[in-house]
UniProtKB/Swiss-Prot annotation:
DNA-binding keyword on record: yes
Entries under InterPro entries matching the protein: MraZ, MraZ_C, MraZ_dom, MraZ_N, MraZ_sf, SpoVT-AbrB_dom, SpoVT-AbrB_sf
Subcellular location: Cytoplasm, Nucleoid
Keywords: Cytoplasm, DNA-binding, Repeat, Transcription, Transcription regulation
GO biological process terms, semicolon-separated: negative regulation of DNA-templated transcription initiation
Ranges where the SpoVT-AbrB domain occurs: 5-47, 76-119
Protein name: Transcriptional regulator MraZ
GO molecular function, a single term: DNA-binding transcription factor activity
Pfam families: MraZ
Length: 142
């Protein structure tokens, strides 16, 4: 499980130090892909494979299914942290999330999200007020 908020820096090669508490779950491999809300999502490889099996069950005759499968797969990059615990984010994904040197790495239970620091600040401030209401809605749906 991924929890917490961290603020590593993105270096000139597009690498950042993965927080130590996330490394055990991601050392065997990870997939970086487009996330929702213009962030990046990082999944353990096994979790990503399970997720894509479910997505692959959708009918390719449905345009939205095709589009989603295509965009998810085209934006995905499989990798592993290097010996120092750094992860390299491909240029295309850095552009998608508008990442600069200042980033925020967020544990989001089943995945790790990587945000541009300014965008994370805007997003989290906007969501803070609605958090209590979200709790009622999320648990009412289960």
């Amino acid at each position: 499980m991924f929890l917490g908020t961290h603020t590593p820096k993105l270096d000139e090669k597009g690498r950042f130090f993965l927080p130590a508490k996330f490394r055990d779950e991601l050392d065997d491999g990870l997939v970086i892909t487009r996330g929702q809300d213009r962030c990046l999502a990082i999944y353990p490889t096994e979790t990503f494979v399970e997720m894509t099996r479910e997505i692959a069950k959708g009918s390719v005759s449905v345009k939205k299914v095709r589009d989603y499968q295509r965009m998810l797969a085209a934006g995905a990059s499989d990798t592993a942290p290097d010996k120092q615990g750094r992860v390299m984010i491909p240029p295309m994904l850095r552009r998608y999330a508008a990442l600069n040197k200042e980033i925020v790495v967020v544990g989001a239970i089943t995945r790790v999200e990587v945000w541009d620091a300014t965008e994370w600040e805007k997003y989290s401030e906007a969501q803070e007020e609605a958090f209590a209401d979200m709790n009622e809605e999320v648990f009412a749906e289960q």
